[in-house]
């Protein structure tokens, strides 16, 4: 919690280091997670975007 991760690190952790797709798959799946766990997905409180870097989990 509180540590920002770059998209590439998330991609590697979830899909494995041998995934050869676009890192935008992370953005798509973050959006899907927000739809499931956030009360207001357009104003997230749990999964925060760190612009130009990646994402941060806010516990």
Language model features with spans:
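Positively charged, aromatic-enriched patches within helix-turn-helix-type DNA-binding elements
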Residues: 1-53
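Conserved hydrophobic "DFG−1" position in protein kinase catalytic cores
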Residues: 57-59
């Amino acid at each position: 919690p509180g540590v920002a991760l770059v998209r590439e690190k998330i991609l590697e952790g979830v899909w494995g280091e041998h995934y050869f797709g676009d890192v935008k798959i992370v953005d798509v799946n973050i959006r899907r997670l927000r739809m499931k766990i956030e009360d207001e997905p357009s104003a997230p409180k749990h999964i925060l975007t760190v612009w130009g870097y990646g994402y941060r989990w806010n516990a």
